[in-house]
């Protein structure tokens, strides 16, 4: 719907203009620029054929339209707010209607300069296109009225009024909404040094929060991966440690340091091949003691910090051929070499290995018998006897050929590697020959794991089921000896202490341990003489009446 503005000098100034429609408009209402510098035109009769000037609302993006008018300055100023509410009208009025003044020219120039500048918030291209089509000369604006025809469209209505018609049929935004919109638009623009708008702040806060969340998740993922890797590394090290403690890495960790002169003889090639077959690491070089072999253990790098002091193998092997050994014995240098080895390695066990010694001696004796010469048999037996009687941790070994020598050295290397991780023997440890546990015994696995059960089974005539009965009542030797050492009990009470223990029968039911077995266990454990036989102990040998502190 189009709104018309009727402008006439003859109308009453108090007559209100038609009100604008309250319906929302699509395009903003154009402003009207009114200049009353020209004299007021005379009102024409209705029947006169006067062509009015139509000033349409600007169809482009500018909000200003310019209309020449001659409203009085005072009347226009007083009724501007009432008559033109809803329209934006700029009046170029002057006190003198006939002659232009410098103030009016300056005022017009400032207004036109404002018209040339594009309105804030609109596109520059639309504003430039508009000013190209509605160019208004700046000179002599108060005298020349032809500029109004350049910005207007001609039409042929019969009215004598100046109508302002909008080219848009529907406008959805009112002037109040436009003003409000412009206010919001100007306030929402970012100004340097001021806080950002709430919407933009909230958007940026969301973005930063999401980025922080992503970084936190990434950091947590990396921490989990690092902890997982550390846990896997810890488990791997623990596994390697257990392997090392059980001796599974012993053969790979031992290194045989062989003197170069050992490999110069006939046993060199065969010995190297045997080491290669077993996968044992060797190091060939000059040793402090000639013709010697020593061993060292290298701990894997992963578990080396767990064992600051690696295992030490206190063993040294001297390898001699038969002829060389006989010459050393004949010259009296062999015992000197043994003394020098003990001085250098005081805690080491020394072994002297000879190859084909006895066959070489017999061969030379036969030759000497057939062709007598200067050769005499060296005192081999006396020297070997002295090794046993005069030296500690020194012994000898004789091999019949090179194969046996190589086999002995390789086997000795394997044994030295594994013995470092074997359980140490204790006072209650029983050798395999002394453990009288039948193969079909139900509790043989339990007995093998307990030194106390092994010690009980080692006592003659003490069956495994008897030992289990004692073990259930007294789970350790200390608990039983504590009762045996009690001064308040007599020897008779101590001897028959175990007679009433229940023993599981072979065919079911429980039987008593008995007086004989109880007395045997007591006398064997409390005997002061370890050299007597068990039968003598049972019969009363080494009785305890004379022992101090025993009732």
UniProtKB/Swiss-Prot annotation:
Residues 202-239 have a biased composition (Basic and acidic residues). Its main location: nucleus. GO terms for biological process: cell division; DNA recombination; DNA repair; meiotic cell cycle. Its cofactor is Mg(2+); Ca(2+). InterPro entries: EME1/EME2_C, ERCC4_domain, Mms4/EME1/EME2, XPF_nuclease_EME1_plant/arthr. It comes from the Eukaryota. Residues 203-253 form a coiled coil. Residues 37-51 have a biased composition (Polar residues). It is an enzyme of class 3 (hydrolase). SMART domains: ERCC4. GO terms for cellular component: Holliday junction resolvase complex; nucleus. It is found in: Nucleus. Pfam families: EME1-MUS81_C (PF21292), ERCC4 (PF02732). Residues 287-484 form the ERCC4 domain. GO terms for molecular function: DNA binding; endonuclease activity; metal ion binding. PANTHER family: CROSSOVER JUNCTION ENDONUCLEASE MMS4, EME1 PROTEIN. Interacts with MUS81 to form a DNA structure-specific endonuclease with substrate preference for branched DNA structures with a 5'-end at the branch nick. Typical substrates include 3'-flap structures, D-loops, replication forks, nicked Holliday junctions and also intact Holliday junctions with a reduced efficiency. May be required in mitosis for the processing of stalled or collapsed replication fork intermediates. Plays a role in DNA repair and in genotoxic stress-induced homologous recombination (HR) in somatic cells. This is Crossover junction endonuclease EME1B. It comes from Arabidopsis thaliana.
């Amino acid at each position: 719907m189009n709104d018309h503005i009727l402008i006439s000098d003859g109308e009453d100034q108090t007559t209100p203009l038609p009100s604008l429609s309250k319906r929302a408009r699509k395009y903003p209402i154009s402003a009207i620029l009114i200049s009353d510098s020209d004299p007021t035109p005379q009102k024409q009769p209705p029947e006169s054929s006067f062509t009015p000037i139509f000033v349409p609302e600007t169809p482009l993006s500018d909000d200003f339209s310019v209309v020449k008018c001659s409203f009085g300055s005072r009347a226009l100023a007083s009724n501007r707010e009432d008559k033109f509410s809803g329209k934006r009208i700029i009046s170029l009025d002057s006190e003198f209607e006939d002659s232009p003044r410098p103030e009016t020219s300056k005022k017009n120039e400032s207004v036109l300069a404002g018209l040339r500048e594009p309105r804030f918030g609109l596109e520059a291209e639309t504003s430039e296109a508009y000013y190209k089509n509605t160019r208004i000369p700046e000179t002599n604006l108060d005298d020349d009225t032809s500029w109004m025809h350049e910005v207007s469209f001609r039409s042929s209505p019969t009215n004598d009024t100046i109508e302002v018609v909008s080219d848009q049929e529907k406008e959805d935004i009112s002037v109040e909404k436009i003003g409000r919109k412009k206010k919001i638009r100007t306030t929402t623009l970012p100004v340097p040094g001021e806080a950002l708008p709430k919407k933009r702040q909230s958007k940026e806060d969301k973005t930063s929060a999401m980025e922080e969340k992503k970084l936190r998740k990434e950091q947590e993922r990396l921490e989990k991966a690092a902890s997982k890797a550390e846990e896997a590394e810890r488990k791997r090290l623990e596994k390697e440690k257990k392997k090392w403690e059980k001796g599974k890495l012993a053969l790979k960790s031992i290194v045989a340091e062989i003197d170069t002169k050992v490999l110069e003889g006939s046993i060199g090639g065969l010995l190297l091949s045997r080491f290669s077959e077993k996968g044992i690491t060797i190091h060939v070089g000059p040793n402090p003691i000639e013709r010697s072999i020593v061993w060292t253990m290298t701990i894997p790098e992963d578990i080396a910090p767990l064992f600051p002091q690696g295992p030490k193998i206190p063993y040294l092997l001297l390898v001699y051929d038969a002829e060389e050994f006989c010459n050393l014995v004949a010259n009296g240098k062999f015992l000197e070499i043994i003394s020098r080895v003990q001085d250098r390695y005081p805690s080491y066990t020394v072994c002297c290995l000879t190859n084909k010694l006895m066959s070489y001696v017999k061969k030379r004796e036969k030759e000497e018998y057939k062709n007598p010469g200067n050769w005499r048999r060296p005192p081999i037996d006396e020297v070997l006897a002295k090794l046993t009687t005069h030296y500690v941790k020194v012994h000898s070994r004789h091999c019949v050929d090179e194969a046996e020598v190589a086999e002995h050295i390789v086997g000795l290397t394997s044994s030295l590697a594994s013995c470092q991780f074997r359980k140490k023997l204790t006072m209650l440890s029983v050798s395999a020959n002394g453990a009288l546990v039948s193969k079909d015994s139900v509790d043989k696995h339990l007995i093998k794991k307990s030194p106390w059960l092994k010690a009980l089974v080692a006592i003659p005539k003490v069956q495994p089921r008897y030992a289990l009965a004692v073990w259930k009542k007294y789970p350790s030797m200390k608990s039983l000896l504590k009762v045996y050492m009690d001064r308040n009990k007599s020897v008779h009470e101590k001897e028959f202490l175990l007679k009433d223990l229940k023993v599981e029968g072979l065919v079911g039911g429980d039987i008593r341990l008995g007086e004989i077995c109880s007395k045997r266990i007591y006398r064997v454990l409390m005997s002061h003489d370890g050299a007597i036989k068990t039968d003598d102990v049972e019969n009363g040998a080494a009785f305890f009446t004379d022992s101090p502190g025993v009732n």
